[in-house]
From Swiss-Prot:
A GO term, aspect molecular function: manganese ion transmembrane transporter activity
Taxonomic source organism: Alkaliphilus oremlandii (strain OhILAs) (Clostridium oremlandii (strain OhILAs))
Entry protein name: Putative manganese efflux pump MntP
GO cellular component terms attached to this protein's record: plasma membrane
Family that this chain belongs to: Belongs to the MntP (TC 9.B.29) family.
UniProt keyword terms in alphabetical order: Cell membrane, Ion transport, Manganese, Membrane, Transmembrane, Transmembrane helix, Transport
Length: 188
């Protein structure tokens, strides 16, 4: 898998974190640099760690399912992509919760970062099947998610919900396209 494909996957994976970062920014009373950086570090860090965990798990089963690995990659990426598109229609960005400094604490940020990075775990499994070099992949995923999360907080403080659903739809379409590409490369 090349740099361009990894970058597309990284952008697609970061869309859940981007949408959550928009929500964080939307609900912030002030644009605090400290909280913006916290969001970027948590989301970028978890988006880098989860594919590594998935990769480690995937390598344990790689030999036993190598004849169908392209189907597994296609199915996982398609399911994740379809789910992202479906979730884009939900208005799950509520400011009823406390978005003071306490909502940027370890517990709250860990739970939110974990929730937005579950998809990356499944992608890590597909990386193992495709024999992707994991170190550069997780570096790219983490860095892009960090940057897009910071941008998301800024967008949230300025524009609000306008871009959240569009970002999730784009991420879903990218993942489905990458899954189809992987499948077609193995079938043709």
């Amino acid at each position: 898998m090349g740099l361009i494909e990894l970058t597309f996957i990284a952008v697609a994976l970061s869309m859940d974190a981007f949408a959550a970062a928009i929500c964080k920014g939307l609900c912030m009373k002030k644009n605090a640099l400290k909280n913006t950086i916290i969001v970027g570090i948590f989301f970028g860090g978890f988006q880098a760690i989860m594919p590594l965990i998935g990769y480690i798990l995937g390598t344990q089963f790689n030999e036993s399912i190598s004849s169908i690995d392209h189907w597994i990659a296609f199915i996982l990426l398609s399911i994740i992509g379809i789910n992202m598109i479906r979730e884009s229609r939900e208005d799950d960005c509520s400011c009823d919760v406390d978005y003071s400094d306490s909502s940027f604490g370890m517990k709250n940020m860990t739970l939110l970062a974990l929730a937005t990075s579950i998809d990356a775990l499944a992608v890590g499994v597909t990386f193992a099947f495709l024999k992707v070099k994991i170190a550069p992949a997780i570096g790219i995923i983490g860095a892009i998610t960090f940057i897009l999360s910071i941008i998301g907080v800024k967008i949230g403080t300025v524009f609000g919900m306008k871009y959240k659903s569009k970002a999730e739809i784009a991420g879903g379409v990218i993942l489905i396209t990458m899954g189809a590409k992987i499948l077609l490369e193995h079938l043709l």
